[in-house]
């Protein structure tokens, strides 16, 4: 009787579904669509750059009003712009603005004072164009985080609106923060935050866990206003406690899914992207004494499988093939052992 050979093809899904790597920060946001002046409109708020590296002398700031029906940007608009702390509702900067062109443009210089430098209309609106942007010194963008930009459209083409609409937007600016961890030697890591500053980094050598603490308001009404919380770790591959082991991601000690990208030559990038629904669910799960912060945790797990393409199937060994981001594993073995005739 011929020996019956079975080729067993084992597919191991490591991370829920295949996901692409997420980009850095928003830096750009569009409002909800509102109907006024016989058309549907939305407002776009944008900054340049979208991620801070700590050496920026000024930040580009641009506001555009888009006619959603005609899909074009509207010119000759007067605004009331109010930039607010989204957690407490306090106004940081408020001013009247005007652009004869398609977009209102300003340069914001991060300082602990408020000062405007530019031209005004006869109606005392600050003018900002691409060729001559308004310069504003203000306590804004001194670090990465979330700001609320409320844009009230007062007039279009010199015609005042009887009931000026207010567009509310939440704008996220990222920031790269370098830090060090010492285990057997000193390692240089990077953390990217797209929501708020980081109060503390800590590595627990006994538990082999890395954490970053970020202030956060877990009030459910506030959480429902934000689309998601985004953060990233950049870990050198020389750090074997994470490179040679599987990585478990946690938020306030609750295990969550995320993206772990090992495709780079020198570093591992771990992405936290927590949407609104997950944040609301986490509110009921996290320890009550952590309702004032988010703790982004990485735990070193079991030794991970590595690519193995020189195995002998006939001797009962297995071939292991990994996808680029290692979110899919393919294990190939023969049962029973022996040659394929």
Region annotations inferred by a language model:
Residues 1, 15, 331-333:
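A detector of low-complexity, intrinsically disordered, Ser/Thr/Gly/Pro/Ala-rich segments
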């Amino acid at each position: 009787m011929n020996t019956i050979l079975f080729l067993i093809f084992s597919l191991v899904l490591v991370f829920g579904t295949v996901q692409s790597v997420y980009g850095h920060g928003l830096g750009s946001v569009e409002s909800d669509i509102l109907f006024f002046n016989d058309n549907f409109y939305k407002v776009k708020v944008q900054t340049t750059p979208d991620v801070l590296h700590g050496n920026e002398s000024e930040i580009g700031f641009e506001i555009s009003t888009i006619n959603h029906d005609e899909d074009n940007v509207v010119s000759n608009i007067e605004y009331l712009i109010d930039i607010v702390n989204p957690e407490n509702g306090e106004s940081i900067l408020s001013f009247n603005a005007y652009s004869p062109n398609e977009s209102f443009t300003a340069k914001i210089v991060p300082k602990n004072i408020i000062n405007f430098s530019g031209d005004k209309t006869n109606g005392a609106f600050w003018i900002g164009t691409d060729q001559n942007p308004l310069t504003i010194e203000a306590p804004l963008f001194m670090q990465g985080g979330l700001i609320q930009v409320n844009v009230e459209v007062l007039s279009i083409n010199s015609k005042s609106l009887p009931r000026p609409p207010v567009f509310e937007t939440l704008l996220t600016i990222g920031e790269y923060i370098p830090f060090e961890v010492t285990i057997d030697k000193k390692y240089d890591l990077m953390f990217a935050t797209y929501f708020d500053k980081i109060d503390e980094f800590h590595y627990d050598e006994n538990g082999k866990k890395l954490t970053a603490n970020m202030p956060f308001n877990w009030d459910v009404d506030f959480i429902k206003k934000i689309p998601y919380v985004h953060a990233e770790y950049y870990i050198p591959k020389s750090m074997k406690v994470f490179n040679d082991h599987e990585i478990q991601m946690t938020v306030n000690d609750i295990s969550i899914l995320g993206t772990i990208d090992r495709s780079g030559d020198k570093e591992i990038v771990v992405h936290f992207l927590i949407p609104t629904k997950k944040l609301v669910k986490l509110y009921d799960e996290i320890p009550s004494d952590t309702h004032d912060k988010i703790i982004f945790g990485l735990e070193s797990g079991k030794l991970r499988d590595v690519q193995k393409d020189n195995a002998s199937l006939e001797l009962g060994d297995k071939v292991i093939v990994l996808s680029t981001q290692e979110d899919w594993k393919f294990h190939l073995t023969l049962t029973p052992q022996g040659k394929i005739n």
